[in-house]
């Protein structure tokens, strides 16, 4: 299993020990440095959260100095599902390590992804032994979930956000993911940003913040 050993992080604004972890998973050819930029916008409502934005284990040979969770050799549903499955063990091991380090559980963890990172957040979030508090996916795809249909799998609340003008991952991916998740019994909320390309806008940033704040505080009563 490839090991995640580096990346960017932002400690709790409160100065105390983390009471929640927000794991930020970047897109293809990007890095944790891009994703950690979301964290300052969310610290006001989650002052006790540790924000972690690891670099994917593989270097991306296509885009500059970026990283990839897996190489995008194909975009067929089977290729994407296989890629996500191959990358998941490194993320699961990283999560296990951090939860153990800070003596927290899945109920204290939110997963946030962008593009390929959304594929990973959804793949991992739906397959953890216990449900995480929340999954937020920006501009991504839900990889094949047929193997989950007849299993008693974790069903964390999911928020999907996408731009109508996304030239990389069409917004139709959001609608397909919403339909599939609902069919599987997952609580899913969606937001479409009109005229937005393959990026995150201020409205999406606010919605993501409010969603993970609500779910993290709901799943860890007594923390305010």
Stretch-by-stretch model annotation:
Residues 2-108:
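Serine-hydrolase catalytic machinery in alpha/beta-hydrolase-like enzymes
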Residues 19-20, 106-107, 153-158, 184-187:
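Short, proline-enriched alpha-helix->beta-strand connector loops that line the catalytic pocket
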Residues 37-39, 170-180:
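Short alpha-helix in the alpha/beta-hydrolase fold that links the catalytic acid
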Residues 159-162, 166:
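Short beta-strand/loop motif that positions the catalytic acidic residue
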Residues 32-33, 146, 201:
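Short N-terminal helix/helix-N-cap motif within the alpha/beta-hydrolase-1
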Residues 175-224:
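C-terminal catalytic histidine-bearing segment of alpha/beta-hydrolase fold enzymes
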Residues 99, 107-154:
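Primarily recognizes the serine-hydrolase "nucleophile elbow" in alpha/beta-hydrolase
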Residues 54-55, 112, 136-139, 161, ...:
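Alpha/beta-hydrolase-fold catalytic nucleophile elbow
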């Amino acid at each position: 299993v490839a090991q995640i050993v580096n990346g960017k992080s932002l400690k709790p604004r409160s100065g105390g020990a983390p009471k929640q972890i927000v794991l930020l998973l970047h897109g293809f050819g990007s890095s944790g440095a891009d994703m950690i930029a979301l964290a300052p916008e969310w610290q006001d409502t989650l002052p006790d959260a540790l924000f972690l934005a690891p670099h994917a284990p593989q270097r991306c040979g296509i885009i500059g100095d970026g990283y990839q969770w897996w190489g995008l050799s194909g975009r067929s549903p089977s290729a994407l599902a296989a890629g996500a499955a191959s990358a998941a063990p490194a993320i699961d091991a990283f999560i296990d390590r951090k939860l153990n380090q800070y003596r927290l559980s899945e109920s204290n963890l939110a997963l946030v992804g962008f593009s390929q990172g959304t594929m990973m957040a959804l793949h991992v979030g739906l397959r953890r032994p216990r449900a995480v508090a929340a999954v937020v996916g920006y501009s991504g795809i839900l990889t094949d979930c047929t193997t989950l249909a007849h299993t008693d799998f974790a069903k964390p609340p999911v928020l999907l956000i996408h731009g109508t003008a996304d030239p990389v991952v069409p917004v139709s991916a959001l609608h397909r993911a919403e339909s599939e998740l609902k069919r599987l019994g997952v609580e899913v909320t969606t937001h479409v940003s009109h005229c937005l390309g393959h990026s995150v806008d201020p409205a999406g940033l606010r919605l993501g913040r409010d969603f993970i704040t609500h779910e993290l505080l709901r799943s860890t009563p007594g923390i305010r």
